[in-house]
Amino acid sequence: MTGVKLALVAVNTMPEPRQIVADNLARVQDRIHAAAQAAGRDPASIQLVAVSKYVDAATAALLVDAACTTLGESRPQQLWEKAAAPASAGVRWHLVGRLQRNKVRRTLPLVELIHSVDSERLLAAIDETAAALSLAPRVLLEVNCSGEADKQGFSAEDARHLLAKLPTFSNVRVAGLMTMAALEGGEATAHANFAALRKLREELVSMAPPGVELKELSMGMSGDFEAGIAEGATIVRIGSLLFNGLL
């Protein structure tokens, strides 16, 4: 009987999902703040995109309750579903995963930023659709800094070649660059990949046509965002850390 009572007490004292998410968010924000300070940066210069691909719309909405209203999705279909849910009112959505051209029209009206423009053909499709819908979407060019064959994105050389053409895509604001670190190699490799993107951005900015600013660097996820911040990330994309205890 005593054991049963103890078990009941343990169940009754478990934190509610709302509290779990709020506590996880606070820990992540503390780590972002500490990483920024260690790099001599203003923590306010780094935007957290909370990636909700692991959970349903109701659980994702717990982030909004905790005052985190910028959410990201990896798949357009999941973004569409969550954006339509009443619980998602007030969310600013980012698409952080791959976007196929046949999904551009439905996605553009829903998103604040697309992180994953990985080809000139996709950029052209976004530009054409934006003109038809009277939109001016912000996008990032995805660059493959790790050299991994299974990753999407421009090579550094292709990004250089595209730079001069960017003003012709007059309905799209190319706001910066995005990359993902190599899966293997640990922290040192993540630093190297992120440093490569920062240096490429600096190079592109130095020769960019008028009106092309490339201010944003989206780099760093749950396992390597501190390396991203150390190397100059302005946006970090964090998912699983925010839902520890619920997955």
Label each residue range with its predicted role.
Residues 3-225, 229-231, 243:
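Conserved alpha/beta-domain cores
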Residues 233-247:
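Gly/Pro- and small hydrophobic-enriched strand-loop and loop-to-helix capping segments
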